[in-house]
């Protein structure tokens, strides 16, 4: 993902947070910048706020003890609103004004707890006070007591069925408060409690608070905050019910914008739109009340806090390495079943996949939820079959758009690393060679390379030698992966997509989507190191291909993307210049002749069509092995029989059905027809052919351990 895309995603999250969440997120990020960056940001902020008269008025009121004292005569609703707008503007060191705030806060919190109202605003006030540089250790100690009261109050009302939903109460802030107690009144790495979050003291910049991760305690971590911002790991969610007089400050279930894949459908229902987000530890919102003894995660509206459950009380498989359960909270959220996250946090991956309605009924799960959970788990069990279906579709030359969308959604579902009961000697003997020579390109089986070699050797004579399929690679090409090896099946499909991208016409959208998918796989714990090395090699090859196209080619693709060349039939091969001739002006047409410089036959034999296709037709009926290779040949020859990629064994121009004689230099560069010579300054076709041939050869030699051949 490019930097601008990352900024766009972050901006999308940021817009969805409320002011309190935004403040905490920015404070967390500011602790990661250098002194120069911090000073620059300070200058920018001071400059932009210099003429903000309204802010100066609010700041004056926020630091006036007399005005704050008068708020005690106002209604509780108005006082809460005033505190939310003025407390963040309190200047560190203004002890008199701070004392007035500390008098008001207990009264407001007591009223909120007693009447079970304004819980969201109360939590925001507590968060502001806890992260404010003006508060002392004693102040935070008093505020922690109110957190306990909020916990007790909502716990008492949890069993009442006559009460509606309340926003979650953060038990975990008490835990983090104790960490803050060890910081000697140093907040977030600034030594002096009078230092604000922006005003930086250069001499104290590196003074990090003990007991705080990365020098900062993230008191808030909303359900929409990405894992890279939250520095504390996620816990399961406990949402406690109460009266439904909560704050109207409410945001949607998820504020994360969709993935950068335009018009992405829901596919087979793996995830809903709100869960098409970057992978990472996710915390849960408070739209429903889970049956959970665990700590809660911030509800929507307040952004709340992300916290850890007391490790001595219960097991949490969501946080266990290699459990395959890390993505269960996000998966449940996409199904709107996240209220049962605590129930799943006590299960292993195998127990979850074997759940029945009877077991769920014993856990007091409602009938509708039981049915939905069982159906959703059944869909998880069908993922491997779906991957096989996608693999067949890709091999048959179908569109890559839908498979990529399915893969994007599937990678967000719970996936556990496959552990084979026993490793066969054949696999063990093949593993060293694969590890020593990881394939750098998109992996194909030896069948395609053998076919390519035979075609190359027959380039001069115009014939085709029958390809030989090695026993090892032939087995890999037909043998299915073990049942349950979802990462292996996923990797195999990714290889098929890579092959398709390398040999079909450039599609920037598909390439970008594929690279994003690779990034998710590379950080997923379910994939083995061997699989990740293979995925990384495919990423490097696709990136190399992406960079090899002139920028104009990618920009012009949208002009002809919808046009199809009849000569290609159903082939997904490179489009010819005739398919876009109508969309591009033919000014100053020229007739290009083949120059004396030729690409070596070992490279071009792969694309020689006349002998390739005819020989393939002659041998198909008599040789079942070659019939298995029929789909492989589709990648390199025109199944419709047109001479769209003739061999370059001639020295004169020959008119073909798929490419007119009169073309523009732009068309020649875009489609790189091997029968016509490109200018010496544009050697893209040579580079691409070399890369493709080298790719096939190296992948055939490196085929091995995890049985993820791309053919």
Curated annotation (Swiss-Prot):
GO terms for molecular function: RNA binding; translation repressor activity. Gene3D superfamilies: Smaug, PHAT domain, Transcription Factor, Ets-1. It holds the Pfam family Vts1. The modification Phosphothreonine is found at residue 424. Residues 568-581 have a biased composition (Polar residues). Coiled coil: none annotated. It is found in: Cytoplasm; Cell projection, Dendrite; Synapse, Synaptosome. One of its GO terms (cellular component) is synapse. Belongs to the SMAUG family. Acts as a translational repressor of SRE-containing messengers. This is Protein Smaug homolog 1. It comes from Mus musculus (Mouse).
């Amino acid at each position: 993902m490019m930097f601008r895309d990352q900024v766009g995603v972050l901006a999308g999250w940021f817009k969805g947070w409320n002011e309190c969440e935004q403040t905490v997120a920015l404070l967390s990020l500011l602790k990661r910048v250098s002194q120069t960056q911090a000073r620059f940001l300070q200058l920018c902020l001071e400059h932009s706020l210099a003429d903000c008269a309204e802010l100066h008025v609010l700041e004056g009121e926020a630091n006036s003890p007399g005005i704050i004292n008068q708020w005690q005569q106002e209604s509780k609703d108005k006082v809460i609103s005033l505190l939310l707008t003025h407390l963040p503007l309190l200047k560190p060191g203004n002890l008199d004004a701070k004392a007035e705030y500390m008098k008001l806060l207990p009264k407001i919190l007591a009223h909120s707890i007693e009447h079970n109202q304004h819980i969201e605003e109360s939590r925001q006030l507590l968060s502001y006070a806890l992260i404010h540089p003006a508060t002392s250790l004693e102040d935070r100690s008093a505020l922690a007591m109110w957190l306990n009261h909020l916990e007790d109050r909502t716990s008492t009302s949890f069993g009442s069925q006559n009460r509606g939903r309340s926003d979650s109460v953060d038990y975990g802030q008490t835990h983090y408060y104790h960490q803050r107690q060890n910081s000697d009144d140093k907040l977030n790495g600034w030594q002096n409690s009078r230092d604000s979050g922006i005003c930086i003291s250069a001499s104290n910049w590196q003074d990090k608070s003990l007991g705080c991760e990365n020098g900062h305690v993230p008191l808030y971590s909303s359900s929409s905050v990405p894992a890279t911002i939250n520095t504390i790991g996620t816990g399961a969610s406990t949402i406690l019910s109460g009266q439904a007089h909560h704050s109207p400050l409410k945001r949607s279930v998820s504020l994360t914008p969709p993935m950068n894949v335009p018009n992405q459908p829901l596919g087979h229902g793996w995830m809903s739109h709100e869960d098409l987000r970057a992978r990472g530890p996710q915390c849960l919102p408070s739209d429903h009340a889970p049956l959970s003894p665990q700590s809660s995660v911030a509800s929507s509206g307040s952004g709340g806090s992300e916290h850890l459950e007391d490790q001595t009380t219960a097991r949490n498989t969501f946080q266990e390495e290699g459990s395959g359960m890390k993505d269960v909270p996000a998966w449940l959220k996409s199904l709107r079943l996240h209220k049962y996250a605590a129930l799943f946090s006590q299960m292993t991956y195998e127990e979850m996949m074997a759940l029945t309605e009877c077991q769920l009924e014993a856990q007091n799960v409602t009938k509708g939820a039981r049915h939905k959970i069982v159906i959703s788990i059944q869909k998880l069990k069908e993922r491997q079959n779906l991957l096989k279906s996608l693999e067949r579709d890709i091999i048959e030359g179908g569109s890559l758009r839908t498979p990529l969308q399915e893969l994007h959604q599937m990678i967000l579902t719970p996936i556990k690393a496959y552990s084979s009961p026993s490793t066969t000697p054949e696999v063990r003997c093949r593993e060293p060679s694969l590890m020593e020579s990881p394939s750098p390109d998109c992996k194909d089986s030896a069948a395609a390379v053998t076919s390519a070699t035979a075609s190359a050797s027959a380039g001069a004579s115009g014939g085709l030698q029958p390809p030989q399929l090695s026993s090892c690679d032939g087995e890999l090409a037909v043998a299915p992966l073990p049942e349950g090896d979802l990462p292996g099946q996923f990797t195999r499909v990714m290889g098929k997509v890579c092959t398709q991208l390398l040999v079909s016409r450039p599609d920037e959208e598909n390439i970008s989507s594929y690279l994003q998918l690779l990034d998710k796989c590379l950080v997923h714990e379910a994939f083995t190191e061997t699989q990740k090395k293979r995925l990384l090699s495919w990423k490097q090859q696709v990136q190399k291909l992406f960079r090899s196209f002139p920028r104009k080619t990618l920009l012009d693709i949208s002009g002809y993307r919808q046009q199809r060349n009849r000569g290609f039939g159903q082939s997904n091969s490179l489009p010819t210049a005739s398919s876009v001739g109508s969309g591009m002006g033919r000014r100053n047409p020229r007739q290009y002749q083949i120059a004396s410089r030729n690409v070596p036959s070992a490279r071009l034999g792969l694309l020689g069509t006349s002998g390739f296709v005819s020989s393939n037709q002659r041998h198909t009926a008599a040789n079942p092995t070659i019939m298995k290779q029929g789909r492989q040949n589709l990648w390199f020859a025109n199944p419709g029989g047109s001479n769209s990629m003739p061999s370059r064994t001639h020295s004169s121009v020959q008119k073909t059905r798929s490419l007119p004689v009169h073309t523009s230099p732009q068309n020649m560069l875009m489609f790189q027809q091997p029968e016509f010579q490109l200018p010496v300054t544009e050697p893209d076709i040579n580079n691409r052919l070399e890369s493709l041939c080298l790719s096939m050869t190296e992948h055939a030699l490196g085929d091995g351990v995890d049985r993820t051949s791309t053919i």
